[in-house]
Regions:
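Short, flexible/disordered secondary-structure transition segments
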Residues: 48, 195-199
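Catalytic binding pocket for nucleotide-activated donors in carbohydrate/polymer assembly enzymes
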Residues: 13-15, 65-179, 183-191, 199
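Conserved alpha-helical elements of sugar-nucleotide-dependent glycosyltransferases
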Residues: 3, 33, 180
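Surface beta-strand/loop "capping" patches
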Residues: 200-213
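Nucleotide-activated donor-binding/catalytic signature segment of Leloir-type glycosyltransferases, i.e.
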Residues: 11, 19-63
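Short hydrophobic signal-anchor/transmembrane segments that target glycosyltransferases
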Residues: 1-12
Length: 213
C-alpha cells in the first residue's frame, strides 16, 4: 500500500485508478479483495484518486473503454481465459498494462503496451503475487506514467500516441472475426475439402483402403 500511495499522491505525475468488477457469490477470496480495496479507497489521502464502481456490466464497460488511458489487467497466471475486455480496450485506443496471460501473450509487444512480469509461474501463489505486484509498480513508475507525461512537442504525448495507433492496428487486424474465419478457411476447411476429393477420387479406392486398415 505504501508504494501505491506514493504513486497516486505524486503531484508531478497525478494518477487516478478506477476499479470495476464483480465477484462470484462463491468467490470468497474475490469478495475479500473487493472489501480491502473499498476500505483502502475510503482513506482520506487517496479518496479522490481511487474509484471503485459497483455493478460492473457492459453498459459501464462502454464508458470505461471510452474514457480510460490505460487498461490494467492483473489475473493470476495462468487462469485468464482470454481477456476480451483488453481487446476491446486496444480497439478503442486504450493501452494495455497486463500480466502475460490470455490474449496478451499474443498481442503484447513493447510498441503496443506494457507487460507485467515475464510470464513466470510459481507454486507459491503468495510469492507469485509479490513478484507481480513489484513488477507492476516498476512498470507504472518507470515506463507507463512517464510515457504518458512525456510531452516533447507541444502538449501531445508523442510516444503514447504511437503506441495507441500500433495497438489499435494490431487488435483490429488480428483479433477480429474476419481473421478468425480466414484462418479456419485456409487451415481447416480448404485442406479438409481437398482431402475429401482425394479420398473420393478413382472410385474412392483410398477411402476403402483406409477403412480396411
Amino acid at each position: 500500500p505504501e508504494r501505491l500511495e506514493s504513486i497516486i499522491n505524486n503531484t508531478k505525475y497525478p494518477v487516478q485508478f478506477i476499479f470495476a468488477g464483480k465477484a462470484h457469490p462463491r468467490d470468497n477470496e474475490g469478495k475479500e479483495l473487493i472489501k480491502q480495496l473499498f476500505q483502502f479507497a475510503s482513506k482520506a489521502e487517496v479518496r479522490d484518486k481511487i474509484v471503485f464502481l459497483e455493478d460492473y456490466d457492459m453498459h459501464l464497460a462502454r464508458h470505461l473503454l471510452q474514457g480510460a488511458d490505460a487498461w490494467l489487467n492483473t489475473p493470476r497466471r495462468p487462469l485468464e481465459a482470454c481477456g476480451t475486455s483488453g481487446i476491446k480496450a486496444a480497439i478503442n485506443g486504450v493501452l494495455n498494462v497486463s500480466i502475460l496471460d490470455g490474449w496478451w501473450c499474443e498481442g503484447y509487444s513493447k510498441e503496443r503496451g506494457w507487460r507485467i512480469g515475464n510470464g513466470e509461474e510459481y507454486e507459491d501463489l503468495g510469492y507469485q503475487d509479490t513478484v507481480e505486484s513489484q513488477a507492476l509498480y516498476n512498470a507504472l513508475e518507470n515506463e507507463v506514467i512517464p510515457c504518458f507525461y512525456e510531452r516533447k512537442n507541444g502538449n501531445r504525448p508523442g510516444n503514447w500516441l504511437k503506441k495507441m495507433k500500433a495497438s489499435m492496428k494490431m487488435a483490429m487486424e488480428y483479433f477480429c472475426s474476419l481473421r478468425m474465419v480466414s484462418d479456419y478457411e485456409k487451415q481447416y476447411y480448404i485442406p479438409a475439402a481437398r482431402r475429401w476429393e482425394e479420398l473420393l477420387a478413382e472410385e474412392a479406392e483410398e477411402a476403402e483402403e483406409a477403412e480396411e486398415h
